[in-house]
Design a protein with these regions (language model features):
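Eukaryotic proline-rich, low-complexity intrinsically disordered regions
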Residues: 2-14
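A cross-family detector of function-defining hotspots
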Residues: 11-123, 150, 154-202, 206-211
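A short, surface-exposed helix-loop junction/capping segment
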Residues: 55-62, 133-143
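Short, structured interface segments
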Residues: 117-137
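Mixed-charge, Lys/Arg-rich low-complexity intrinsically disordered regions
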Residues: 144-148
Length: 211
């Protein structure tokens, strides 16, 4: 054997121990991971379309949670920009006496939706983060309980279609709930509790008829 001995890495890159950058694809896996609690079937289909494994999805979620909880974590808005890039749009809004901005990014997995972050107009704190319908995209026709299928609508769309809707506290930070009445296909009004993850409908509990 000659000297020096051949490097064990001469046929490939030397491992550095560094993780690859967290990408927009990874963020979509984070969205799916929480949705898998209620809809494993659609999530599995979506994961296959993205060409990633179950282990990839779990690892992406693990890395995201570590980023969020780290004492050295960057502010939420900066974190989204680092992962998703510059927003597709920044729209001024006024909610009560507060001036804010809605930042929106495209989500390739759901072309008709956008990921929206609501933040103070001067930047800084993030007040809300969820999926909303993309500008110009056709909204769903929500008329009956049967129209409320998984992933069919956003929180805002359900609240408008079946007003007045009562907000409910979610079971996790990325979950929301709505309680409202809606007719079934026979016209009988039912009590409905709808649960959303990242702003997208996941499941409903229907009881009734309303007294």
């Amino acid at each position: 054997m000659g000297w020096p001995p051949p490097s064990p890495y001469e046929d490939g890159p030397v491992p550095t121990g560094k993780q690859s950058p967290f990408t927009a694809l990874d963020f979509q896996l984070v969205l799916l991971r929480r949705m898998a609690d209620h809809n494993p079937g659609p999530v599995e289909d979506a994961r296959r379309r993205l060409g990633v494994s179950l282990a990839d999805m779990r690892e992406a979620n693990k890395r995201w949670q570590a980023m969020v909880r780290s004492p050295r974590s960057r502010p939420a808005l900066s974190r989204y920009r680092s992962v998703l890039g510059e927003p597709e749009s920044r729209t001024p809004r006024r909610i009560g006496d507060l001036d804010c901005e809605a930042w929106r990014w495209p989500v390739p997995l759901w072309p008709g939706l956008r990921f929206e972050v609501l933040t103070a107009a001067a930047g800084g704190a993030v007040w809300n983060e969820w999926l909303v319908r993309a500008p110009g995209a056709e909204p769903p026709a929500l008329r009956t309980v049967e129209d409320l299928t998984p992933w069919s609508c956003t929180v805002d769309e359900a609240a408008r279609a079946f007003a007045p809707a009562r907000p409910l506290e979610g079971s996790a930070p990325t979950r929301w709930g709505l309680a409202f009445t809606a007719p079934d296909a026979s016209g009988v009004r039912r009590e409905v509790v709808a649960e959303f993850t990242w702003g997208l409908l996941q499941r409903t509990e229907v009881s009734g008829p309303r007294p």
